[in-house]
Every structure is written in C-alpha cells, then in structure tokens.
C-alpha cells in the first residue's frame, strides 16, 4: 500500500463590497464577504491544495489561474470536483482529511456538520473521514482583528 500526505493553506481578507461568506461549500450569514477572484472559500481552496500536494500536482493556482475570467466568482466546489477527477485518475483514495478554520468571527461551529456533509458528497467519501475544527487567535493579528480568515488542511491518501 502506498500513502501520500498533503498540506494546504489559504487565507482571504474580509471586504465590505460583499455580504456573507462561503466556507466548506456552506453559505454563512455575515456583514462582510471575502475578497477573492472566485467565491473565496478558504476551506475548499486549502483542501484542493492539500490533495494536489499529496498527488505532487502543484497547487490550485497552477490549475485554475486567478487571472482567468472563467473562474471569476466561480463556486469553489467546481475546483474540488475537478481535483476529485485528478485523484481518481491517479488511482488514489482519501483515507482522511483534517481541517482547521482560523477565524475570530463569524462562529463556525453551527455550520461544521453541513460543511462535512458537503465535502464528503463532492469527494464521494464518508463524513467520518472528514474532521473540521475551528479556532480563534485570541484577538491577535489580522485574524484577531477580524480582518480575514485562514484555513489549514491535511489529507492522507492511499492506493
């Protein structure tokens, strides 16, 4: 059996030009939005990078350029579905995924189960294979000042 591990990280800053945020494919009511070329889903972006990293295929920016207008405001679930195809082509399966959302606000806990279900559906895996947790920075740094959100994701693949 062959194992591969990948790590992904993403961060987006808040903008008053939008309202509500999308994290893990779930829309969350908030008075600000996330500045991004796509929908700004930091969790899916980090997950894409983790899977691509484990496969040795670079990162999300290599495959979906942020200068390409076809990806302007696109739903990030599209990226994850495309990367699932790459995973299948390489004949790897997901053992587990562990995600950490770092945000002072809004609170993520009420939305985590919906996020897990959304990601499991796209990746065609069991919800039990995905862990999502959220933490704050105790009001330190740009996240603590509620200027943005960051996410780390680790995934383990096998074949």
Swiss-Prot record:
Free-text comment on the cofactor: Binds 1 divalent metal cation per subunit.
The UniProt site entry described as Transition state stabilizer is assigned to 37, 136
Q: What is its EC number?
A: 4.6.1.12
Its Gene Ontology biological processes? isopentenyl diphosphate biosynthetic process, methylerythritol 4-phosphate pathway; terpenoid biosynthetic process
The family database entries (Pfam families) matched by this protein are listed as:
YgbB
Positions of 4-CDP-2-C-methyl-D-erythritol 2-phosphate binding:
10-12, 37-38, 59-61, 64-68, 103-109, 135-138, 142, 145
Q: Which reaction does it catalyse?
A: 4-CDP-2-C-methyl-D-erythritol 2-phosphate = 2-C-methyl-D-erythritol 2,4-cyclic diphosphate + CMP
Query: Which keywords belong to this entry?
Result: Isoprene biosynthesis, Lyase, Metal-binding
SUPFAM superfamilies recorded for this chain?
Answer: IpsF-like
Subunit structure comment from the entry:
Homotrimer.
**What does this gene product do?**
Involved in the biosynthesis of isopentenyl diphosphate (IPP) and dimethylallyl diphosphate (DMAPP), two major building blocks of isoprenoid compounds. Catalyzes the conversion of 4-diphosphocytidyl-2-C-methyl-D-erythritol 2-phosphate (CDP-ME2P) to 2-C-methyl-D-erythritol 2,4-cyclodiphosphate (ME-CPP) with a corresponding release of cytidine 5-monophosphate (CMP).
Q: What is this protein called?
A: 2-C-methyl-D-erythritol 2,4-cyclodiphosphate synthase
